């Protein structure tokens, strides 16, 4: 535990190593194959230990929404008065149950990673998310009480056009409208 570090207020728990999605820009999905998820029981035990030291359990992995039992883990942490804070979530894998668990866990912000402003460019980089899937995840998270959504985008991708960059602004605006309701 290092209180001076960037995540010093969290007890960090590695929930998975590697990634199953194979996004073309990400090394984790290629370097750390096959993906390995820690069991729910192992994660719960780590959370119990972590809650003895910190009130926030930081869940670490390349993509947390696909970790088996992650919603149950967030509920488990919330039931014990803690907050589960996952790293980035893939919007099309977020379930309503996970969104509610994150809201119950007093998360003020959650990060999703559309990466590109258009479905065309997301397909190019193998980040196969549709805008309706991204907006549905935003609706569920905001509806569950999450007050802020952080979005990860990249600019300068191969085949990117001006319209793709403009799409970042448009998608961000649509998500922002949901957050401000």
Task: Specify the residue positions occupied by each region the protein language model found.
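Short helix/loop capping segments that flank catalytic or ligand/cofactor-binding pockets
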Residues: 22-25, 35, 68, 120-121
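Conserved, mostly hydrophobic/aromatic
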Residues: 19, 23, 43, 86
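Short, glycine/acidic-rich beta->alpha junctions
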Residues: 7, 11, 35, 42, ...
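Cys/His-rich finger/ribbon microdomains and the adjacent scaffold used
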Residues: 1-7, 36-39, 52
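Iron-sulfur (Fe-S) cluster-binding segments and ferredoxin-like electron-carrier domains
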Residues: 25-42
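Conserved SAM/AdoMet-binding glycine-rich loop
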Residues: 44-181
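N-terminal pre-triad scaffold of radical SAM enzymes
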Residues: 2-24, 108
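Glycine-centered small-residue hotspots that permit tight backbone geometry or close packing
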Residues: 18, 22, 29-30, 113, ...
């Amino acid at each position: 535990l290092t209180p001076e570090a960037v995540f010093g207020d969290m007890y960090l728990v590695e929930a998975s190593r590697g990634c199953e999605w194979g996004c073309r820009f990400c090394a984790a999905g290629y370097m750390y194959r096959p993906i390995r998820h820690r069991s729910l029981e192992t994660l719960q035990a780590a959370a119990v230990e972590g809650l003895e030291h910190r009130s926030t359990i930081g869940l670490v992995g390349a993509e947390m929404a696909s970790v088996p039992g992650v919603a149950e883990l967030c509920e488990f942490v919330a039931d014990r008065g803690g907050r589960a804070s996952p790293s980035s979530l893939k919007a099309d894998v977020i379930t309503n149950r996970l969104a509610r668990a994150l809201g119950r866990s007093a998360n003020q912000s959650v990060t999703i990673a559309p990466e590109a402003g258009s479905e065309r460019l997301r397909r190019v980089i193998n980040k196969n998310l549709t805008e309706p899937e991204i907006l549905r995840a935003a609706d569920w998270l905001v509806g569950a009480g999450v007050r802020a959504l952080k979005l990860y985008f990249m600019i300068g991708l191969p085949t990117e056009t001006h319209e793709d960059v403009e799409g970042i602004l448009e998608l961000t605006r649509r998500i922002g409208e949901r957050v401000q309701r």
